[in-house]
Amino acid sequence: MRSHYCGDVNKSHVGQEVTLVGWVNRSRDLGGVVFLDLRDREGLVQVVYDPDLPEVFNVASTLRAEFCVQVKGLVRARPNSQVNAQMKTGEIEVLGKELTIINSSEPLPLSLDNYQNNSEEQRLKYRYLDLRRPEMAQRLMFRAKVTSAVRRFLDSNGFLDIETPILTKATPEGARDYLVPSRTYKGQFFALPQSPQLFKQLLMMSGFDRYYQIVKCFRDEDLRADRQPEFTQIDIETSFMTSEQVMAKTEEMMRGLFLEMLNVDLGEFPRMTYNEAMRRFGSDKPDLRNPLELVDVADLLKEVEFAVFSGPANDEEGRVAALRIPGGASLSRKQIDDYTKFVGIYGAKGLAWMKLNDLTQGLEGIQSPVLKFLNEDIVNEIISRTGAQTGDIILFGADNATVVAESMGALRLKAGEDFNLLEGQWRPLWVVDFPMFEKINGSFHAVHHPFTAPRGVTPQELEANPANRVSDAYDMVLNGCELGGGSVRIHNQEMQSAVFRILGITDEEAKEKFGFLLEALRYGTPPHAGLAFGLDRIIMLMTGASSIRDVMAFPKTTTAACPLTNAPGFANPQQLAELGISVVKAAKTED
């Protein structure tokens, strides 16, 4: 039905007859000549109909927005005065000779031109219309090209694209599973995979030493701008490669991807340990475009008569951190109060501050409600450590180390945006040397997942002292977003059992949930390592979209619903009976 895409017609086609199909983006009658902007996935082209062909002209006069049509005509150059530099096809137009209305369109329930006026609910309910917008179409086409480039790289490096099951068994990976009831085994359930983690490890045990898959994963978790209940991973696993080799290979892939798709050279990725990232930036995925850093000052404040500072300063699990904001002395009291409320979201009880109005006047040139508790030597050392100057403000977080990191790390990002401090467009890095475990309510939990290998310890040493052990794990971070995370895996049954016990999984539970893995580890398991990238998040960053919903064809809402299909929906009683399931209504609570 077509000879060319609309957006591909150019000056080289002048004098040629073309056949185009697409949608009427806009139609206008100017002095007896009808101009159509015809749109398809590749772009727009202007089609002109004049009264010399009255039959065709009359049909063209009836066209409305979003009619689906076929156009046959002659490509001609536009006069210089009519060249449209804003259009890819702006140097030419098509003189229409034939016109077929393939399908008419009713008035749209949402605007494609002023899409900002459409609610998120509308856009998702009529997603098939929203995707006609050039911006949305370009993102999905960009995504397809990225996916193709990733496949080419991995294929050329000896990786095998192998599918793993979607119906599988629940595993403890940090979020709730989506469960699928079994009709054959009533009362039993499959789980949709949160990742192909165990299957890709089993593939390494099978001898397929380089695996990849671009795969759907499912997590029933609370949603944010960068989360969806179903999402896509670039999943990679290798045998006989160290963490350094995996990082080098995947960095090569990412650098090549940015160069090919955006003509951006990311350069070599710097390395930073988890502890350094948390100390300097309050985050394990720091945005290095932001020059602000947290500075420890607890050692200066142990003896001050101000419990807000001295309490955490003398607590092994406490921290006092200072954050210097250049030019921040201009902040009003209300703005400081707003910052105080902001850190309160992260559990901080308050926010001390120090305005450096004029350092030539010594303490007289400093404004702060806590200044009376600090002597001049302490103040001068804080100023020296933070590198603060006249006109700056220093903000203080004092609490347990976790609260300080989370609250001041978030404030660092907010202040960087508020004061327009971000430098450069792309700042990648690797974060390495993650803790093996974290303690929550007195119990150990895996920082990555239970199959991550510790670094440099025996199973006996790990069980004897699990705290502060370092894992052989690594995250690739770009502009404050985790692009992907991975690790060396445990390939020894004794070590895997030890990790399970540390996590509170008894040997009996481990056998029930992971018996297949523990048995597989007995049969010559090779050392193996891998990494998984969030494809949706990569596309979001590369296209500048504000949400991963804008780079997915049919995403869910933030409440994990689909307005287009009205999913999730109720199952009919016969289906439930076949599955042996009865629905229990939630009891009504008394007011």
Swiss-Prot record:
Entry-linked InterPro entries: Aa-tRNA-synt_II, aa-tRNA-synth_II, aa-tRNA-synth_II/BPL/LPL, Asp-tRNA-ligase_1, Asp-tRNA-ligase_1_N, Asp/Asn-tRNA-synth_IIb, AspRS_core, GAD-like_sf
Record flagged with keyword Heme: no
Substrates-to-products reaction catalysed: tRNA(Asp) + L-aspartate + ATP = L-aspartyl-tRNA(Asp) + AMP + diphosphate
EC number, UniProt record: 6.1.1.12
Record-linked Pfam families: GAD, tRNA-synt_2, tRNA_anti-codon
Keywords recorded for this protein, A-Z: Aminoacyl-tRNA synthetase, ATP-binding, Cytoplasm, Ligase, Nucleotide-binding, Protein biosynthesis
Domain of life: Bacteria
GO biological process, one term: aspartyl-tRNA aminoacylation
Gene Ontology annotations for the cellular component aspect, listed alphabetically: cytoplasm
Molecular function as annotated in GO: aspartate-tRNA ligase activity; ATP binding; nucleic acid binding
Similarity comment: family membership: Belongs to the class-II aminoacyl-tRNA synthetase family. Type 1 subfamily.
Assembly notes: Homodimer.
Function according to Swiss-Prot or TrEMBL: Catalyzes the attachment of L-aspartate to tRNA(Asp) in a two-step reaction: L-aspartate is first activated by ATP to form Asp-AMP and then transferred to the acceptor end of tRNA(Asp).
Protein name stated in the entry: Aspartate--tRNA ligase
Record gene name: aspS
